[in-house]
From Swiss-Prot:
<feature type="active site" description="Proton acceptor">
    <location>
        <position position="59"/>
    </location>
</feature>
<dbReference type="InterPro" id="IPR003010">
    <property type="entry name" value="C-N_Hydrolase"/>
</dbReference>
<feature type="domain" description="CN hydrolase">
    <location>
        <begin position="13"/>
        <end position="259"/>
    </location>
</feature>
<feature type="active site" description="Proton donor">
    <location>
        <position position="133"/>
    </location>
</feature>
<comment type="function">
    <text>Also exhibits in vitro acyl transferase activity, transferring the acyl moiety of short-chain amides to hydroxylamine to form hydroxamates.</text>
</comment>
<feature type="active site" description="Nucleophile">
    <location>
        <position position="165"/>
    </location>
</feature>
<dbReference type="InterPro" id="IPR036526">
    <property type="entry name" value="C-N_Hydrolase_sf"/>
</dbReference>
<comment type="function">
    <text>Catalyzes the hydrolysis of short-chain aliphatic amides to their corresponding organic acids with release of ammonia.</text>
</comment>
<dbReference type="Pfam" id="PF00795">
    <property type="entry name" value="CN_hydrolase"/>
</dbReference>
<dbReference type="InterPro" id="IPR023719">
    <property type="entry name" value="Aliphatic_amidase"/>
</dbReference>
<protein>
    <recommendedName>
        <fullName>Aliphatic amidase</fullName>
        <ecNumber>3.5.1.4</ecNumber>
    </recommendedName>
</protein>
<dbReference type="InterPro" id="IPR050345">
    <property type="entry name" value="Aliph_Amidase/BUP"/>
</dbReference>
<comment type="similarity">
    <text>Belongs to the carbon-nitrogen hydrolase superfamily. Aliphatic amidase family.</text>
</comment>
<keyword id="KW-0378">Hydrolase</keyword>
<dbReference type="GO" id="GO:0004040">
    <property type="term" value="F:amidase activity"/>
</dbReference>
Length: 339
């Protein structure tokens, strides 16, 4: 893991995160023009950082937030489509991979709300991963939720997963990506004040807990409704920050992520190898007791057992100590039911 140079090497993936200014758009034509601006940014960053292999833009950076529901439907995209063609061509032209936000992606059933989607485009201009946000930021966001994570071979073989904004507040999604083999988890977010300190802290903790690189791209600026705090960052698999932007609009951070180092750590680290130890619980004591050398593999957590085997029951259980309705009468949001 290296930070401070503009290069990369056969073993290191050059990753840049962009503090992109949150746009405020209303039409498809404006979205397409913004796509062309993102393409220009890619070209400029590649010129300045010749080692760049992967560039990452925040959630909502392509469309902005459509606060008008009709505009949200009118600007929703198909994948592939005109918008992705512009972004893919920029990746191909500059020989870089890119992560881009599409808010939203048309639902398969026309009347249902769109998805909040990320795409990973390779340096040939091909879409190699499409991820739909599993945990939309309720009660404000009205995206239809996705239902799974993905892992693909990224630049130089580094294994990459994508997650979006509020997803990252749930340890389960990080662990799911890591346990599927992800070595770099990309979190694109359009996170606003007041939760700045919490969001800076959680990505470091999740990198440490899952022994993985984390790259965060967050929006900056004010869109007339929310103020976005930026702080796009790149975190090492040991939880240390390699590079972090401030609140500046269109700031960029860059680091080189070693493929060999993370694989070496996952193979040879012992006391802090959380991924291995979770599925080999207590192996030292089990071995000393003459019960084999693999530890205990079974899941000890009652909540997860219930969730998998009886999701409705798990939902009822959490409602007992939270609330039974999605809405809150003391602070209603939209037309969400409060009873």
């Amino acid at each position: 893991m290296r930070h401070g140079d503009i290069s990369s090497s056969p073993d290191t993936v050059g990753v840049a995160v962009v503090n992109y200014k949150m746009p405020r758009l209303h039409t498809k034509e404006q979205v397409l023009e913004n796509c062309r601006n993102i393409a220009k940014v890619i070209g400029g960053v590649k010129q300045g950082l010749p080692g760049l292999d992967l560039i990452i833009f925040p959630e909502y950076s392509t469309h902005g937030i459509m606060y008008d529901k009709q505009e949200m439907f009118d600007t929703a995209v198909s994948i592939p489509g005109e918008e992705t063609a512009i972004l893919a061509e920029a990746c191909k032209k500059n020989k870089v991979w890119g992560v881009f936000s599409l808010t939203g992606e048309k639902h398969e059933q026309a009347k249902k709300n769109p998805y909040n989607t990320l795409i990973l485009v390779n340096d040939k201009g091909e879409i190699v991963q499409k991820y739909r946000k599993i945990l939309p930021w309720c009660p404000i966001e009205c995206w239809y939720p996705g239902d799974k994570t993905y892992v693909v071979d990224g630049p130089k073989g580094l294994k990459v997963s994508l997650i979006i904004c509020d997803d990252g507040n749930y340890p389960e999604i990080w662990r799911d990506c890591a346990m599927r083999g992800a070595e770099l988890i990309v979190r694109c977010q359009g996170y606003m004040y007041p939760a700045k300190e919490q969001q800076i802290a959680i990505v470091k903790a999740m990198a440490w807990a899952n022994q993985c690189y984390v790259a965060v791209a967050n929006a900056t600026g004010f869109d007339g409704v929310y103020s976005y705090f930026g702080h796009s960052s790149i975190i090492g698999f040991d939880g240390h920050t390699l590079g972090e932007c401030g609140e500046e609009e269109n700031g960029i951070q860059y680091a080189q992520l070693s493929v060999q180092q993370i694989r070496d750590a996952r193979k040879y680290d012992q006391s802090q190898n959380q991924l291995f130890k979770l599925l080999h619980r207590g192996y030292s004591g089990v071995f000393a007791s003459g019960d084999g050398d693999k530890g205990v593999a079974e899941c000890p957590f009652e909540f997860y057992k219930t969730w998998v085997n009886d999701p409705k029951k798990a939902q009822e259980n959490v409602e007992k100590f939270t609330r039974p309705s999605v809405g809150v009468a003391a602070c209603p949001v939209g037309d969400l039911p409060t009873k």
